[in-house]
Curated annotation (Swiss-Prot):
Subunit record text: F-type ATPases have 2 components, CF(1) - the catalytic core - and CF(0) - the membrane proton channel. CF(1) has five subunits: alpha(3), beta(3), gamma(1), delta(1), epsilon(1). CF(0) has three main subunits: a(1), b(2) and c(9-12). The alpha and beta chains form an alternating ring which encloses part of the gamma chain. CF(1) is attached to CF(0) by a central stalk formed by the gamma and epsilon chains, while a peripheral stalk is formed by the delta and b chains.
GO molecular function: ADP binding; ATP binding; proton-transporting ATP synthase activity, rotational mechanism
Listed Pfam families: ATP-synt_ab, ATP-synt_ab_C, ATP-synt_ab_N
Designated name of the protein: ATP synthase subunit alpha
Gene name, Swiss-Prot/TrEMBL: atpA
The keyword Translocase appears for this protein: yes
Amino acid sequence: MAEIKPAEISAILKKQVEGFESGATLEEVGSVLQVGDGIARIYGLSNVQYGELVEFDNGLEGIVLNLEEDNVGVVLLGASTGIKEGSTAKRTQRIASLKVGEQMVGRVVNTLGFPIDGKGPIGGDLYEMPLERKAPGVIFRQPVTEPLQTGIKAVDAMIPVGRGQRELVIGDRQTGKSTVCIDTILNQKEFYDAGKPVFCIYVAIGQKASTVAGIAKMLEEKGAMAYTVIVAANASDPAPMQVYAPMAGAAIGEYFRDSGRPALIVYDDLSKQAVAYREVSLLLRRPPGREAYPGDVFYLHSRLLERACKVIADDDIAKNMNDLPDSLKSIVKGGGSLTALPIIETQAGDVSAYIPTNVISITDGQIFLDGDLFNSGVRPAINVGISVSRVGGNAQIKSMKKVAGTLKLDQAQFRELEAFAKFGSDLDAVTLNVIEKGKRNVEILKQGLNSPYTVEDQVAIIYAGSKNLLKNVPVNKVREFEKDFIEYLNNKHRDTLDALKAGKLDDKITDVIEATAKELSAKYN
C-alpha cells in the first residue's frame, strides 16, 4: 500500500489555494422590458452612461441613446432575433468602436468594421477607434492650401476642392451625384501610382447590396481598391447600422488623417442617414420637429462633418490633439487631412428643404447637379450658377487659377444670354461671340463616365476654350478636337504639360498651346 505523505498533500493544497481565483465578478445587469423595430427598453441599468455599449445574453450589442427615469432605450447593432422580454443585458463600460488598420484598405466592411466581402478576417496591426469622436479643436487645424484633384474639369476649374475641405454634392435622384464622387476616387490612382496615395473611404448608406457590389467591382477593375475602403450599411440593415455607418467611415478616415496622411471620404448619402435617424428617434419616442426629423438632426450632421479637416503640420502640437484615442498616440503625425464629399438628394430641385439647407450651412461649398442639364446631355450636369467652393480657391494650382479665372463668369453670362437669345434672332456680334464661345466651353466641360482628366490636360484644354481658340471648330466636333488636342500635346509637348502640372503658365507655354490649337482646328475650316 502506498505511503501517504501529509507534507506533500498540504503543499499541493497550498499551491491550489494560492492559484484559486474567484469566478464572481460584479456586473450590472438589466432585463429587457420590450423589444422591436431595432429598439430595446431595458430596466435595471441605473448607472449606464449615454452612448455606452450594452451586451445582451445572445452576444448582440446595442448603444444606449435614451436615459429615462425607470428604463433606458437601446438601439440594437444587428437583428433582434433571440432577444425577448425578460432577456438579460449587461453594461460593458465602453463606447462603440471599431478596429482600423492598414490591411483594411481594399476591403468592404460593415458599420462595426467587420469584413463582409468574403475575403477572410482583417489582419495586421489594428487600432481601436471610437465611432463618435470630438472634432479637432481650432489650434490643431490649419487652412486648406493643397488641392484635391477630382479629375472633373468643371469642378477643378470652377469649384475647386482642397484637402481638408467639406464640399457638398447635391441634386435630384439620377443626376450623377455618386458618379462625381466615384470619379474623384478613381482620379486618386495617379497619386497612388506616384507613391503619394490619398486613401479613400466610400460609405454606402441604405443602398441596394447589388449597387454596392457593382461599385466595388468597378473600383477593383480600375485598380482603385488598392487605396479604398468601402463601408456598407445596406437597405436591408437595421436603421441604427445606417445611422452609424458614416461615423464608422469617419473613424477610418481619422486613422489616416491622424497618422499624417491625406484621406478622402464620400458619404453616399446623408439624406438616407437622416431618414434612418428619424426612424430611430421616433421609435425612441423623441419629439418630432420639422418634417418629423428630431431636433438634433442638424447636430448629427455637423458633428460628423466637422471631423473632416486639415491637421496642423507641427507634430508636437498634433500629438496633443483633443479626444485622441489611446491606441493612436504612438503613431500620430501632423499634416494629415480628411476631405469630405457628403451627398444629399433633393426632391424636384428643392434646395430649401430642411436637410439640404442644414448641410449647405455646415459645408464649405456645394456642387449642385441639375436634372434638366443632365437630360439635355450636359454631363456632369453641374449648375455653375448655384455651385460654389468657399475655400478651395486658395488650393488651386497657379496655372489653373490663371486659366479658369474668368471661366465661371463667362459661363454664367452665356447662360443668361442664351435664355435671352431664345426670344429674338437679331443679336449683335459681341453677344453672338459670347454665345458661340459659351457653347464650345459647355462641350469642353462635358466628360464621360469614369474618365477623369489629369490637371495638366485640364489646364491646356480650358486655356484653349477661354481664349476662344476653338472658334473655327463646329460645336458638334469639339469633343473630337479635344481628344486630338490632348493626344497631340502628350505625344509632342510632354515638357509643356509637365510645366503646367508644376503650376507654370508663361508665354512659352501659351505659345505652344495656341500653335497646337491653331494647327488642329485648321482641318475643320
